[in-house]
A protein has these predicted regions:
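Short Lys/Arg-enriched alpha/beta "domain-start" segment
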Residues: 1-47, 143-148, 152
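A short, Trp-centered hydrophobic/proline-enriched beta-strand micro-motif
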Residues: 20-27, 133-135, 165-170
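Short, flexible beta-strand-to-coil junctions
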Residues: 25-32, 61-67, 171-174
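Short, well-ordered strand-loop elements centered on a beta-strand within folded domains, enriched
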Residues: 32-36, 68-76, 89-90, 177-180, ...
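Cytosolic ligand/metal-binding cores
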Residues: 37, 53-56, 65, 185-229
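Non-catalytic accessory segments adjacent to catalytic cores
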Residues: 39-143, 216
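Short, flexible loop/turn elements at secondary-structure junctions
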Residues: 63, 139-141, 172-174, 185, ...
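SIR2/sirtuin-family catalytic core signature
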Residues: 147-192
Length: 229
């Protein structure tokens, strides 16, 4: 990492320890990541998608919005990584935010293996009965955090490794730390012209470049997504 990235890692990791709500992301093909942070008050807990209208910020949304699992909106009060995190005041959390954080953490402690097996049984039955052509079942794995692990350093490594993907790192006291990477563009556009991407299949980069040839399996998976859209 560069000296600037190393300094940024120390500050960003400190923001997490202080409980600051922020997001950092790098768009596909860009060199530099974007940063935004809410400097005061609580993040918005939004329980209906329509309530996002007219608002600006970084959105953290579940697949299914419920009163117990709402949409989180980080307000972009600041767009620059602070030069020093030591002088920042840690915002207080209200009862609403605290109760959501407790719900989120308790959900993660459920019997993941048992829940996954139950979901898999439903999925495989639906596929065998031809109710659906394609289903994707995610799973969760808990691992012990290594001493000295830096979420910010992992973000910068992901940016270098996944140059064609959207890479993000975000934190709120309600959700904890989330980091991910995806080549999928759900929606993009402006001035009345909007686009989406039908992306499916799994292939590795070939000599650092996107693959040009797709086999029948991957073409079939892509067609499922295109038909759904």
């Amino acid at each position: 990492m560069t000296l600037e990235e190393t300094n940024n890692c120390e500050i960003i990791d400190e923001l997490i320890r202080q409980g600051r709500s922020f997001a950092m992301y790098r768009n596909p093909g860009e060199e530099e990541p974007h940063f935004l942070m809410q400097t005061c008050g609580e993040v918005h807990l939004i329980r209906k998608m329509e309530d996002l209208n007219g608002r600006t910020g970084f959105v953290i949304a579940p697949f299914r919005v419920t009163p117990q699992c709402p949409i989180i909106l980080i307000r972009p009060d600041c767009h620059e990584i602070p030069s020093c995190a030591g002088n920042l005041h840690t915002p207080a959390q209200g009862d609403d935010a605290a109760s959501y954080g407790q719900q989120f953490r308790s959900d993660r402690s459920l019997g993941a293996k048992k829940a996954y097996k139950a979901c898999f049984d439903v999925f495989i039955r639906a596929l065998r009965e031809r109710t659906f052509d394609k289903l994707v079942l995610s799973r969760r794995m808990t691992v012990r955090r290594e001493p000295g692990f830096s979420p910010a350093a992992a973000f910068y490594r992901a940016c270098r490794r996944y140059i064609y993907s959207y890479v993000y790192l975000c934190y709120t006291p309600q959700t904890g730390v989330w980091m991910g990477s995806t080549p999928e563009i759900i929606l993009s556009g402006e001035k009345g012209e909007w686009n989406t991407v039908a992306l499916a299949g799994t292939q590795s980069l070939q000599n650092g470049e996107l693959p040009q040839q797709w086999d029948e399996k991957n073409r079939e998976e892509q067609e499922y997504v295109a038909a759904y859209i």
